[in-house]
């Protein structure tokens, strides 16, 4: 993708540069007449913690990469509140999967 010219007008604004957001932006960008803005709250996924599967445990719970959601306590599981990882990086949760397919 190219860096767009300075503009305050957008045809499409996509919130979240996860897998779906990036694919959508790419497809829309095939029409050179459209101004598209892709917004991501997190960082680029260039960290070795993301690139090396053995370091993947260092990503979960790390506020730089993970939104650190916590589920409501579950009565069927002794009211335990489980952590629910969600990617806060370019690539979204796909960047946190430890390259497991």
Regions found by a protein language model. Give the residues of each.
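N-terminal redox-cofactor-binding region of secreted/periplasmic oxidoreductases
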Residues: 1-101
